[in-house]
Amino acid sequence: MKNDVISPEFDENGRPLRRIRSFVRRQGRLTKGQEHALENYWPVMGVEFSEDMLDFPALFGREAPVTLEIGFGMGASLVAMAKDRPEQDFLGIEVHSPGVGACLASAHEEGLSNLRVMCHDAVEVLHKMIPDNSLRMVQLFFPDPWHKARHNKRRIIQVPFAELVKSKLQLGGIFHMATDWEPYAEHMLEVMSSIDGYKNLSESNDYVPRPASRPVTKFEQRGHRLGHGVWDLMFERVK
């Protein structure tokens, strides 16, 4: 499995300016289980980065709606969603190999055939490998909020990124985001509301209740116990 992780920053026209990452590499040490999963299940469920567009029917062996999850962490919610929706296909992207290993192990244990994973930067994957108008949904749950003002430019939700996601969604496709940091939720709302071609699915034109389709993570459960809020945003591509 290759692990060449990079992420470009864009100018106002969406062109890469220079290399800047929206994440911090925290590879950590692989557990024996994660290492075993990477060695044994990656050949079946893993997708290497290339500069060739993916053919989803060929990748999954069928025609089905495809959901892309960016930054799936340890993969618990992604595996749960793939298990609950066998009629759909799921592609997850995560830059940290322990998380990829954990996700592969869980997916194998559940016997999933509708899940594939990548270990690469999602921005480059979107540019180079995801065909336009091909995704039913893009999910971005709890991305790094980059709390300090001087680091705000590292937040993955910026206008060029949201435009890029829109180009990959089918007409009627959904971009679903969630964060537990209210200033980032406000930033997401401002960015998404500024882009022509997206429709906010919130009745109050801000946030939506957590949909049943998004599992509550252990991290989120802990936050609830501590009184922390979570904000979900869902925007539909309408043109």
From Swiss-Prot:
Pathway linked to the protein: tRNA modification; N(7)-methylguanine-tRNA biosynthesis
Pfam family for this entry, one: Methyltransf_4
Annotated region (Interaction with RNA), positions in chain: 150-155
Catalytic activity: guanosine(46) in tRNA + S-adenosyl-L-methionine = N(7)-methylguanosine(46) in tRNA + S-adenosyl-L-homocysteine
The protein's enzyme class: transferase
Source taxon at top rank: Bacteria
EC number: 2.1.1.33
GO cellular component, one term: tRNA methyltransferase complex
Family: Belongs to the class I-like SAM-binding methyltransferase superfamily. TrmB family.
Protein task: Catalyzes the formation of N(7)-methylguanine at position 46 (m7G46) in tRNA.
Subunit structure, as described in the record: Monomer.
Name the UniProt record assigns to this protein: tRNA (guanine-N(7)-)-methyltransferase
Species annotation: Escherichia coli O6:K15:H31 (strain 536 / UPEC)
This protein's encoding gene: trmB
